[in-house]
């Protein structure tokens, strides 16, 4: 049962109208910006939309509104089911359109793209793997290698993340922000307005690139290791005598730079 007090795109034509108007306004603002590649209309739809009919209808309306003011930028179309179901979204309705899919939490196999490559070839529309990540370095290397072997462009999520080890930049979790998180989870007292403001400003400062911990092994796995088995030193500054941390093993693939029995699959 639809509750009109809550936001729902697919149950409200009024909200769909607002989305169309919003995208037209965005396109008006950025129509001449050459450094913007295009517009990804809706991220990871996950709704019961039989035949993809309503999804396509809304996409077509947004596209038409954008094209009234901007005929230059790419239109990125994500499928249903978190961008992986393109039922009803073919054939294309614009001559500058890309189909965008995502991949998370599943193993990497040689046939992982077999479900979507035929759509690219049959519809003559490029593919874009618009979001992936949250996994091991070996997983990154394997999947990116597969994408590039099949001429599929890609983007990763995310470049910076709080207190994590699977993004290129790790952001330090400050105590004030942890207090906010504890309160949200019902596990702590409510911060004062002043405490919350100070905590968020400290987090914003921690998010600056110069204040993040750079994990060089991740970009190495994503770019260099996709084309070579070569092993290179983790850092040119490490010398003996001196201290070398155990974690600073050489940069390279498993079984070449290091050996680990659990490195990939869907973790």
Regions from the PLM with identified roles:
Residues 1-88:
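Active-site mouth of glycoside hydrolases
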Residues 51, 58, 64-267:
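Substrate-binding clefts and catalytic carboxylate motifs of secreted carbohydrate-active enzymes
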């Amino acid at each position: 049962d639809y509750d009109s007090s809550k936001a729902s795109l697919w149950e409200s034509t009024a909200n769909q109208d607002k989305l169309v108007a919003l995208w037209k306004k965005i396109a008006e603002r950025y129509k001449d910006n050459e450094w913007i590649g295009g517009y990804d209309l809706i991220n990871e739809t996950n709704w019961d939309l039989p035949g993809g009919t309503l999804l396509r209808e809304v996409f077509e309306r947004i596209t038409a509104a954008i094209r009234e003011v901007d005929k230059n930028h790419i239109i990125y179309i994500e499928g249903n089911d978190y961008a992986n179901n393109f039922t009803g979204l073919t054939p294309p309705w614009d001559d500058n359109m890309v189909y965008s899919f995502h991949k998370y939490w599943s193993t990497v196999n040689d046939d992982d793209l077999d479900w979507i490559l035929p759509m690219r070839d049959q519809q003559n529309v490029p593919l874009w793997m618009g979001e992936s990540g949250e996994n091991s370095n070996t997983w990154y290397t394997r999947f990116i290698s597969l994408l590039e072997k099949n001429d599929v462009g890609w983007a990763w999520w995310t470049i910076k993340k709080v207190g994590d080890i699977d993004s290129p930049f790790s952001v330090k979790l400050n105590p004030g922000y942890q207090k906010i998180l504890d309160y949200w989870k019902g596990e702590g007292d409510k911060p004062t307005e002043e405490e919350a403001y100070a905590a968020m400003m400290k987090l914003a400062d921690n998010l600056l690139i110069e204040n993040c911990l750079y994990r060089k092994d991740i970009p190495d796995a994503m770019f260099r290791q996709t084309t070579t088995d070569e092993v290179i030193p983790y850092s040119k500054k490490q010398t003996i005598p001196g201290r070398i941390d155990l974690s600073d093993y050489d940069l390279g693939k498993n079984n070449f730079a290091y050996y680990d029995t659990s490195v990939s699959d869907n973790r």
